[in-house]
Amino acid sequence: MGLETEKADVQLFLDDDSYSHHGDVDYADPEKFADSGHDRDPHRLNSHLKVGFEDVIAEPMTTHSCDKVWICSHALFEISKYVMYKFLTVFLAIPLAFAAGILFATLSCLHIWIIMPFVKTCLMVLPSVQTIWKSVTDVIIAPLCTSVGRSLSSISLQLSHD
């Protein structure tokens, strides 16, 4: 439990087909990502996700655990992240993709067949409504406001200091 002077390296060996190559890739830099094969996030929707060990667990310089503990925790972190992600995607990815597909199909159908025809109908009717509203304003509201304004403009107040 003393001060460790030697640095130890951690290496995980996984099959190329079964593990994502994006573990330490900065998604904001496309040049680093170009050689990693098929890009599953071409629009960088999840570039904010940082799930590297150093981004989650860090020890300050004044308090370090033993190198073996650090190495084992790093290895367990990477393995558990890998296994849990695979486990969750096996059980959740297909049902959630199905639900998202139904949701987006429903929203698209509503937008195409209900919302846009309603908006277009309103835009077709608005010029005639605008003409009617202008006539009502000119005939009723404008004279009323003018007479009220003239009546109230003749009122004067005088304050006296008694």
UniProtKB/Swiss-Prot annotation:
One of its GO terms (cellular component) is Golgi membrane. The modification Phosphotyrosine is found at Y19, Y27. Keywords: Cell membrane, Cytoplasm, Golgi apparatus, Membrane, Nucleus, Phosphoprotein. It is found in: Nucleus; Cytoplasm; Golgi apparatus membrane; Cell membrane. Its main location: nucleus. Pfam families: Caveolin. GO terms for biological process: caveola assembly; endoplasmic reticulum organization; insulin receptor signaling pathway; mitochondrion organization; negative regulation of endothelial cell proliferation; positive regulation of dopamine receptor signaling pathway; regulation of cytosolic calcium ion concentration; skeletal muscle fiber development. Phosphorylated on serine and tyrosine residues. Phosphorylation on Ser-36 appears to modulate mitosis in endothelial cells. Phosphorylation on both Tyr-19 and Tyr-27 is required for insulin-induced 'Ser-727' phosphorylation of STAT3 and its activation. Phosphorylation on Tyr-19 is required for insulin-induced phosphorylation of MAPK1 and DNA binding of STAT3. Tyrosine phosphorylation is induced by both EGF and insulin. Residues 1-86, 108-162 are cytoplasmic. One of its GO terms (molecular function) is D1 dopamine receptor binding. The modification Phosphoserine is found at S20, S36. Residues 87-107 dip into the membrane without crossing it. It is a peripheral membrane protein. May act as a scaffolding protein within caveolar membranes. Interacts directly with G-protein alpha subunits and can functionally regulate their activity. Acts as an accessory protein in conjunction with CAV1 in targeting to lipid rafts and driving caveolae formation. The Ser-36 phosphorylated form has a role in modulating mitosis in endothelial cells. Positive regulator of cellular mitogenesis of the MAPK signaling pathway. Required for the insulin-stimulated nuclear translocation and activation of MAPK1 and STAT3, and the subsequent regulation of cell cycle progression. Monomer or homodimer. Interacts with CAV1; the interaction forms a stable heterooligomeric complex that is required for targeting to lipid rafts and for caveolae formation. Tyrosine phosphorylated forms do not form heterooligomers with the Tyr-19-phosphorylated form existing as a monomer or dimer, and the Tyr-27-form as a monomer only. Interacts (tyrosine phosphorylated form) with the SH2 domain-containing proteins, RASA1, NCK1 and SRC. Interacts (tyrosine phosphorylated form) with INSR, the interaction (Tyr-27-phosphorylated form) is increased on insulin stimulation. Belongs to the caveolin family. This is Caveolin-2. It comes from Eulemur macaco macaco (Black lemur). The lineage of its organism: Eukaryota, Metazoa, Chordata, Craniata, Vertebrata.
